[in-house]
Structure formats: structure tokens, C-alpha cells
């Protein structure tokens, strides 16, 4: 279960466990025995789950290298990494010793930045944990008698009971002077977070500038021009305009055109060729070759037989029927007539071969057509310095014209969006942004009423026998009230990030890297607003109407948020402790097993029929920063918000475990197991920093609310300048540091190498085999198939992709009809 699902389920359980007396009083946990039992149960179960998953991975890793070492087997850049031993635990120190430089060279800047965030979080939480244990915990215990451990802290009364020896003692009298720790450590932790964040940012900027300044790829020398007026809509006029700025020479220009017809033909061809391959395979049969045990058990098949004979029989290009096979030639149903009400059965192989031949003719004719130009062009300069000067300058005195941006990698371009008009892209973008905002803000409106059905009082009305049984068995009651929300809402909350990803893909963005950054932003907003802020600020509402009243009051008066935060956070501490234990100890190790890929593999294997479909089974699982980064930021925000509360030491301890385990697991996945095709050159770091600033603001608001509730008005007002400083600093950070995370400084460019300064790199072909990791090495993806080649120039793949023949047993798909097949080699997974 993801963080989204587990957090939503647990939060709904908290709402369901609210007061049953119908009052609107705030809910407070008042059963120390239950809380202590839940904490121990959560810890034991999570530890058992995590250790089981980790041991299972250690056993299966050397056996299922096709899954757990998929990236290293198929990526040249990953092949430079050290070979991991096949022993049970021997791979752990080898992985730990891989340096940040090796991570950068193998997985790129995105992986380097992502793991740097874990390093920052570990450093920060370690410092907070030391302060919490050495100062904050003793202060809280001395003046309030609170340990910060669920079940140990006592309810209000004249005496307290020691959880260690059971002895009774007088309850400490609260001294208002101790409230200064909320003021002091709000400043200390905010300053510490900003200092460490700036320190890590400087390291990332220095690494990024050095790394990109020494690149000579086509991507680094290319800009994307948008808003091109009609009178400058040709290559020659654009070249004249750019070179007239006297910043450098133009190497090549690609003006985007309205290629919709051609793109649709290529997509249709891929569908037809797959149907043809299935028809042939159904007729002649195919079994995947047996491997040496490095794949999942379901891939253990008997070797093919008589492939050489079949290859000879299939080498002809006529439509003569091939006989001698046990299976009959398949048939396909063709509908015709008025309203397509009549049909007839015809030979499927003949039908799809004829359809493929006609589509190939249409494609050849479409490639020779002249298409209308759009307002977008990719301009490749002869030097990186020239391209950087263009993107960092205003090129035209007219607004919204000749606007230069950094270009994505050639294979990262979403070509179908390049021929959308600017108005169409803006309408799509703002419409989907409005839809996502509406869904995110009002998502909890759908969850809170359903949660009320899980209250014991409601169950007594609907299912009285079940309510009586649960009342008699508190452990089963706890499991049921936790499991039912999980069952009801986990699928819904897991589906939300995928819904946002689909919506982001329809916003009209030109590159997949921009889409992923958009997914990061949207998913964090959903997680932060719905699973933290709403359930914390309005978590005291009892029922649906109470929730609506709290929401209405918050919009009327902003101080309600600070007071509600302070009023709810301390009571929700057991929930967040359990959440951190579950995520860090229980669920994180399951990421190593790639349980989703393993669970889906049998269905994918059973549905595979053709050589192409079997080869696609071995492609590495895709890693998405859009799903991973928002969850980790939210965990850090929770730890920051609770950094001064009595339970700060416990929350920071399990947060520290979460980030330590997470860094290790993500390091393995990014380097060895999973593939990430979009490369945004580390541009996610400013987004991470801005969301950390949001966490600091929430922390400061909570401290203001805590002091205000304790009538320490003067001390709460002393935190207002810190609040203003954080807002100002986030603005200053964006103006000062973010440009260095987006552009390459001219001083950082290595002008002694080809393509760096005024020296033009040697001309290269349009396509060449990949060598190492750079932004030109992203594989071209046509019809869901990765091709083992890279584009060296900006050109729509539909214009140049070879029209291969069907990929049949015993015949290389590249030996097709000769339409440029020699320039390509289809990537086929090798079973080493």
C-alpha cells in the first residue's frame, strides 16, 4: 500500500473513532492502554513484514535478475556499475560503497538530486533528534510529565503513574516559562533547515553546473522557440533572425509542422503489425526459448523447434498460404453493409498483410507531403554558450513572440503536442488545473461521510450483532476498524495519483520531463492538502456537517487554521507515529520486491503470444519521481511540524529510519532495477525546496497556535517575524538559486571541448547507438516499443522510422521491406 492509501485509511479510522455521544467537542485519545497496544502491535507487525520482504528479496535477487537487475542488463550506463555478489547479504556493502559520482554518471542528475534530498533529510532529522532527546523531551517531562510515547502519557489528574515501575507520584505543575522552548526551537529548527537546505543546494548547483557544462550533446545546444510569427515561419528566416542576434552560429533548425495525419498513420500501423504478428503466431506457433534461470519462473519454456524451417517458409512476400502446420490459419470477422450489421469471416493473415501494405503506401505518400508550419521550432546552435545566452535573454521586443526555452531531449519531445495552437494548449492547461484544484480541495468531502459509517454507534444501528461482537473483542475491533477503511479507500487513494498523471499528460506540455514535474506538484498538493492539512485542521469535526462547519470557519478566519493545528496535532501524534512505522519498517522493503510488477507478470505472460510481446516482458519497470517525491516530502513535513512537541523524539526517530531505509532502497532501484526515461536535469530540486518551506510555515503556524491556546500571546507574537522571514526567504531563494537550477552559467561551460565555446562539434548522423548516459540516449518509443537507438537531431520519428516487417519467429524484424531498416536495430531483450 502506498503512503497515500495508508494515510487516508488511518485518518479515516481516526475520524471513525471519534466521540460517539453526538457532541461537537474535539476528539482526544483517552485510552492509554489502547494507544500503547496499537503502537506495539504496529511496530511488531511492521517489523515482521519488513524483515520478511527484505529476506525474500535477498533470496530472489540472484535468481530473478531479469526483474531485479533489469536496468543493469539493458542500459550501457548501468553496465559501468560494480557487479553485485550473488550472496545473501554480500550485495549490501557493495551498493553502499557506490559513490555519488557513480550515481551521477549512471543514473543522471534526477537520481542524484533525489538521493541528495534523502541525505539532507537524514542530516536534518538527526540534528532534530539529538535536540529532542537532550533538551525537548526532558523539558516536557519536567514541566508536564509527558514522555511523548502513546500510552505512557497520563490523562489529566492529580497523580501520574510511571510507565517504568508503576509507582505513583504527584503530577508536575505546568510552568509557563517552559513555553519558551516553542519559541526558541521554532527559530532553531527553521534556521537549521534553511542552513542545511542552502548547503545542499550549493553542492547540487556546483555538481549540476560542472556536469552540464562539460556536455556536448545536441540537447544542451538546442533551444525551443515558441511564438514564431507567420512571417518568420521558415528555416531560413529563423536562422537569419537568430544569427542576426550575433550570439553564435546556427547548426540546424527543425520547424514543427502539423504532422497529425502522419502520426496517426504510424500509430495505426503499429496496431496492425501487432495483429498480424498475433495471427502468424497463432498459425505457426511460438514458444519462448528456455533461459538459464535468471527470469521469473513463469518464463521457463521449452526451446522453439523448427524455427529455421519456418524462417525459410516465411521469407517470401507473397500471399501464398503456408501449409504443414498443425494450427489452421486464423480467421477475422469483417463487418459490412448498412450500419455494419452483416459480417463475413476471412483469412486474418491475408487481411492484415494487405492492410499493412496499404498503410505503408499511405505513410510513404504522407511523408512526401508538405505540412503547414506551427509556432514552435527547435534551433540547434554550434555551441552551448550560444544556446544558453539565447534562453537567458529576451529576443524580441513584441510580447509573446520568439520566446526561447530550454529544449528537452529529442526522444523526450511529445510531438503530438507541438502542433497544438498556443490557445489550445493554454485552454487545456488551465482547464485541467481547475479540475485538479477542484478535485483536490473537495476530495475529503467524499471521504468524511463514508467514514461515519465505520463508527461503532452506526454499526449498532445497521449490524447490531457485529457491533456487539466487536465490543467484546477489542483487538478484532481495532483490526476491523483499521481494515475496513483500507479496503474501502485504498484503491481510490492509490488511483488518484494515476488520475493526476493522466490529466497532466493531457495538459498539452511539449516534453515528458515537464509532465513529470507537473505530476510531482499535483500529487504533493493532493497528499499535503487532503491527507495532512484537512485531516489535521478539520480532524476534530465529528461527522459530515461538523466538517463542513470547520471548513467554512477556516475560510472566514485564517487564524482558525493555526488554532485547529495546535488543537489537533498533539492528539494525532499516535496516528503519525504509526504511519511512520508502517511506511519505514513495513512497506518500504516491499518496494525492493517490486510487488506490483511480480503480481502483474503472470497476467502479462499469459497474454503474451508473439516474440515482440515476450521481449517486452523483460523491459525494466518504470520509475516515476512523480509518485515517489511527494510522499517523501510529506513525511519530512510531518517530522518538521512535530519537531517541538513531546512526541518529537519518537517521530523524528522513525522519520530517520524512514529516510535511511528509503535512501538505500531507492538507490538500488534507480541504479540496478528500474528505468527512468525522462530526464529533467535535476529541476525537481527547487520544487522540493519550496515544499520544505511550506512545511516550515505550517510548523511555525502550529507553534503560534500552541502558544495562543496556552494564552502565551506575547510569545506567539514573537514567532510572527519568523513567519514573515520564511515567506521572504522562499521568494529570495526563487530569485537567487532557482535560475542556477534551470540554466547553465556561461562561466561553467568548458569552452575547450567541441560544442562548448565557439568550436562546433563534428557532424553526426541523425541516429547512432547509445554510449553511456546523456540526454540524447533516451530510446525512441514507437507504438509502445523501445528502439535501441537515439536521435541526434530534432526530427519527428514518424518521418524517418523504418517500416519494418512483422516480427515473426526466426526472422529479424529489421529484415523487412528495406525502407531504411539498415539504419535501425530493434532492441530485443537478451536472456543472459
UniProtKB/Swiss-Prot annotation:
Residues 152-171, 291-322, 754-777 are annotated as: Disordered. The chain crosses the membrane at residues 39-59, 117-137, 178-198, 434-454, 483-503, 524-544, 560-582, 587-608, 623-645, 650-672, 687-707, 713-733. It is a multi-pass membrane protein. The keyword Glycoprotein applies. Its main location: membrane. It comes from the Eukaryota. Residues 759-771 have a biased composition (Low complexity). InterPro entries: Csc1-like, CSC1/OSCA1-like_7TM, CSC1/OSCA1-like_cyt, Csc1/OSCA1-like_N. GO terms for biological process: amino acid transport. It is found in: Vacuole membrane. Residues 302-321 have a biased composition (Basic and acidic residues). Keywords: Amino-acid transport, Glycoprotein, Membrane, Transmembrane, Transmembrane helix, Transport, Vacuole. Disruption phenotype: Leads to a drastic reduction in the production of penicillin and its biosynthetic intermediates delta-(L-alpha-aminoadipyl-L-cysteinyl-D-valine) and isopenicillin N. Glycans are attached at residues 158, 214. One of its GO terms (molecular function) is calcium-activated cation channel activity. Belongs to the CSC1 (TC 1.A.17) family. This is Vacuolar transmembrane transporter penV. It comes from Penicillium rubens (strain ATCC 28089 / DSM 1075 / NRRL 1951 / Wisconsin 54-1255). The lineage of its organism: Eukaryota, Fungi, Dikarya, Ascomycota, Pezizomycotina. The gene is penV.
